[in-house]
């Protein structure tokens, strides 16, 4: 029900004091509940934290599972899907370039892009923030709803609002077709507006 989803997204974006789009420098690590774009989050405190089995333990390369079974960026996404101006590239690193990867790690020389987006506030105790919903997700939900309602200018405007904070230089999406059709090929450049969303 796209009209209802659009209404819900619009209402969520009206939250007092909400920052609709945070920059990567404001976000730091992605799971920081004190950033102004957070709509819904909670904090694992030391007495509640589980070092093994939590979402963060699987994601954080300074943690438990994540340090020995790292979550990696798809090479195509990093090399082709993201332009040099896409600041999200800062959330990926080669193990050799990360101080969080031990020098004697079997991964140190691997040519894979590890995600550094998620981490612990304190890896020894398991203290971490868990983010359940951000303003940017509502912005993208609203953009999709506008696209499906054939309000392509409205959808483009919302994407531009996001891109103004996430790209170091303007992102040109003028060549994308005004269409709510979507490709099923995850290793292809977007052709339609909905592909981009």
What residue spans do the PLM features occupy?
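Active-site-proximal, Lys/Arg-enriched surface segment
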Residues: 77-78
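Acidic/polar-rich alpha-helix caps and helix-coil junctions
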Residues: 1-59, 65-67, 81-197
């Amino acid at each position: 029900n796209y009209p209802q989803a659009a209404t819900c997204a619009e209402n969520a974006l009206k939250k007092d004091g909400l920052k609709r789009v945070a920059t990567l420098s404001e976000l730091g690590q992605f799971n920081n509940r004190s950033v102004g774009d957070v709509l819904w989050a909670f904090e694992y405190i030391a007495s509640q934290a589980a070092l093994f089995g939590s979402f963060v333990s699987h994601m954080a390369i300074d943690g438990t599972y994540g340090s020995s079974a790292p979550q990696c960026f798809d090479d195509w996404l990093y090399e082709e899907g993201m332009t040099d101006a896409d600041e999200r590239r800062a959330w990926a690193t080669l193990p050799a370039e990360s101080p969080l990867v031990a020098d004697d790690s079997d991964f140190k020389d691997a040519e894979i892009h590890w995600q550094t987006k998620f981490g612990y506030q304190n890896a020894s105790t398991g203290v971490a923030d868990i983010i359940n919903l951000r303003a940017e997700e509502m912005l993208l939900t609203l953009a999709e709803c506008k696209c499906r309602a054939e309000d392509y200018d409205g959808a483009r405007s919302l994407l531009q609002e996001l891109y103004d904070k996430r790209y170091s230089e303007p992102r040109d999406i003028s060549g994308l077709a005004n269409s709510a059709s979507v490709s099923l090929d995850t290793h292809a450049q977007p052709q339609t507006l909905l592909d981009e969303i």
